[in-house]
Amino acid sequence: MNQTRVFLIFAWLMVAALLWMEWGKDKAAANAPTPIASQAVPAARDPDAAAPAANVPSAQAIPQAGSPAAVPATSTTTATPATTGAAPAITLTSDVLRLKLDGRSVLDAELLQFPQTKDGTEPVKLLTEDAAHPYNATSGWASERSPVPGVGGFRAEQPGTTFELAKGQNTLVVPFVWNGPNGVSIRRIFTLQRGSYAISIKDEVINKSDAAWNGYVFRKLSRVPTILSRGMTNPDSFSFNGATWYSPQEGYERRAFKDYMDDGGLNRQITGGWVALLQHHFFTAWIPQKDQASLYVLAQDGPRDVAELRGPAFTVAPGQSASTEARLWVGPKLVSLLAKEDVKGLDRVVDYSRFSIMAIIGQGLFWVLSHLHSFLHNWGWAIIGLVVLLRLALYPLSAAQYKSGAKMRRFQPRLAQLKERYGDDRQKYQQATMELFKKEKINPMGGCLPLLIQMPIFFALYWVLVESVELRQAPWLGWIQDLTARDPYFILPVLNIAIMWATQKLTPTPGMDPMQAKMMQFMPLVFGVMMAFMPAGLVLYWVVNGGLGLLIQWWMIRQHGEKPSKIIQANAK
């Protein structure tokens, strides 16, 4: 297989992959199911609870200091009549987050270090009370028999409605409390750490009544998905949007919003896992205690898609207490910060691919890219450095590919003679051809195998550049001030066309039929138009990769005793 056919295969595979993704989005939009209401369940005292306690994993009640008397009589959570009326909204601000919450639900969440636009000042709002597309995180308690806090039940223990992480402090702690009837109270503590998007939420149930208290905690994420503008030039539209979850037994799984209830409501008991809602560059997740089991549920509540953890359930004896803790992640898919959370499988939210092998390749490529960035301090130069390293690593394959093509070209006259000799007898022609290949030790697939080996790397790198939030709004130099936006002056796409055209002229084309020749003439223009509206980081990759490929092509031609000028003249005929 000559260089031209290899190039054509690679080019058309790329076009086919992009067209397939575009067709898949259009088909999904046309066939999107109408949201349905969640299934009926036994009533619970909490309006947001959706399952009977019998279906929820239990946890052992944990006594304080070993005896009922250990619960201090002067605690700030001394039993009082149940609180009535809606609690005022509280604002918590750290160096990276601004949260609006009511003690039970996080209603708004702004990511202070991520502006919505390159030149804007408005931060990305991940959780929102927007009437058209609400998106919030809720943690509450439910019970079939015992009193529990409802909407507005939690109250801040400290006066005021605004709490901010002060300079010199690394931790912001804001406690809330619900005082129920008959001496039962739940104390909830929100903890924000400097530089972290993980919010710790710890609940302690204290029972000072004379009867056992029964209930379970639930934690959920719910949103009305945003309808994204479709198009192969819009990475948001073909990045994964939906629910993901992880269990030590089953590993990482996911379900897109458009297919949310196709496989049922999940209803799986998991210990040591997590659940998340993903979108391009950002996500939210509930990460419960590793040693406490929860029932994982996917559901729809009208237009809302819901991912929920139910449990553990507690039976708290009189004079005893029980506690449970979880982390709520509200933030970007920053690989360095995800690693600090020490949560198994959480790195998969950076969705390089749903296939494990491609995800592993993508993680490896990003590891190299991030280390290059630590030295070069610029993501554009890091992309160029990565392409250079890949080209060096794949040079033996490129050399083998060209060597195979050169050998095939030398035997083109003999193949033409065989074709003339056997005429329309294809069986004899193929038999004679295979005997010639065997005698001369020619591998007809020698030019194709290197391509097949390189393709997973190239596709994985594409998703690394699209999915990595680290590159979001990152500049390169001069006119490229955002590697995730298109080239404003189309300089890189034009360079890409020129490099592809020059590569085409340097590619020997013995025996090419007229149809292939016409396809080759239009290929640089097709790719140029396609790349014109792609993110500049991707086009930069193609320009550098193509430029290095052109230099390698020139070098290979001279190494095998051929003259570039003769090839150019032959292709001009």
Swiss-Prot record:
Its placement in the membrane is given as: Multi-pass membrane protein
List the transmembrane segments: 6-26, 355-375, 379-399, 446-466, 488-508, 524-544
Record-linked InterPro entries: Membr_insert_YidC, Membr_insert_YidC_N, YidC/ALB3/OXA1/COX18, YidC/Oxa/ALB_C, YidC_ALB_C, YidC_periplasmic_sf
Instruction: Select a single GO molecular function from the record's annotations and give it.
Output: membrane insertase activity
User: What are the GO cellular component annotations?
Assistant: plasma membrane
Keywords recorded for this protein, A-Z: Cell inner membrane, Cell membrane, Chaperone, Membrane, Protein transport, Transmembrane, Transmembrane helix, Transport
Q: Where in the cell is it found?
A: Cell inner membrane
Entries under Pfam families matching the protein: 60KD_IMP, YidC_periplas
Q: What biological processes does GO assign it? A: protein insertion into membrane; protein transport
Family, according to the entry, reads as follows: Belongs to the OXA1/ALB3/YidC family. Type 1 subfamily.
Protein purpose = Required for the insertion and/or proper folding and/or complex formation of integral membrane proteins into the membrane. Involved in integration of membrane proteins that insert both dependently and independently of the Sec translocase complex, as well as at least some lipoproteins. Aids folding of multispanning membrane proteins.
Recorded hits in PANTHER family, A to Z, give: CYTOCHROME C OXIDASE ASSEMBLY PROTEIN COX18, MITOCHONDRIAL, OXA1
Cite the record's note on assembly. Interacts with the Sec translocase complex via SecD. Specifically interacts with transmembrane segments of nascent integral membrane proteins during membrane integration.
Name under which the protein is recorded: Membrane protein insertase YidC
